[in-house]
């Protein structure tokens, strides 16, 4: 139990730190070590989105990152991976269209890897840690931890 607490505590703290610095509708991408990191993270993120939404009939809009992160490498990799999976990705002008699903993503460097947090329409939330392998590349450190928010009546 003590080991689990020691592993979970940094993840929880990193989640709170990333969330405190943002507006409620912002996404966030911390510094990625290599360009290949964006591809690995994007593929993992699309895996979760694909499990939650039907690709062929879903339009998604990504919550924007702050202006100082506009040139991050993850956002275009995530958009490309979503399109490759069959999702329609709305641009900023289409984001308010009825039926569009909103995705917020937070990526924070943590220990020897990156912590990814995703939410879809403020409902389904997921977290996954990506760890560096012995070759220096990122790989999933386990499955997504998913929390479904209860629907308001």
Predicted features, each with a name:
Residues 27, 38-73:
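Post-signal-peptide N-terminal segment of Sec-exported extracytoplasmic proteins
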Residues 1-20:
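Sec-dependent bacterial lipoprotein signal peptides
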Residues 14-39:
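Bacterial Sec signal peptide processing site at the extreme N-terminus
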Residues 10, 50-52, 108:
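Generic marker of residues within folded, mature protein domains
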Residues 56-153:
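Intrinsically disordered, glycine/charged-rich N-terminal periplasmic/extracytoplasmic linker segments
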């Amino acid at each position: 139990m003590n080991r689990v607490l020691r592993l979970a505590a940094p993840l929880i703290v990193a989640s709170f730190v990333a969330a405190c610095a943002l507006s409620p509708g912002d996404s966030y991408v911390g510094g990625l070590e290599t360009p290949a990191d964006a591809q690995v993270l994007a593929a993992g993120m699309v895996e979760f989105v694909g499990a939650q939404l039907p690709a062929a009939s879903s339009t998604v809009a990504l919550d924007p990152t702050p202006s100082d992160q506009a040139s991050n490498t993850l956002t275009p990799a995530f958009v490309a991976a979503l399109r490759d999976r069959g999702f329609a990705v709305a641009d900023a002008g289409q984001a308010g269209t009825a039926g569009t699903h909103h995705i917020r993503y937070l990526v924070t460097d943590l220990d020897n890897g990156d912590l990814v947090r995703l939410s879809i329409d403020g409902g389904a939330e997921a977290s996954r840690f990506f760890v560096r392998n012995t070759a220096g590349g990122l790989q999933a450190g386990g499955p997504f931890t998913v929390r479904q928010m209860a629907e308001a009546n």
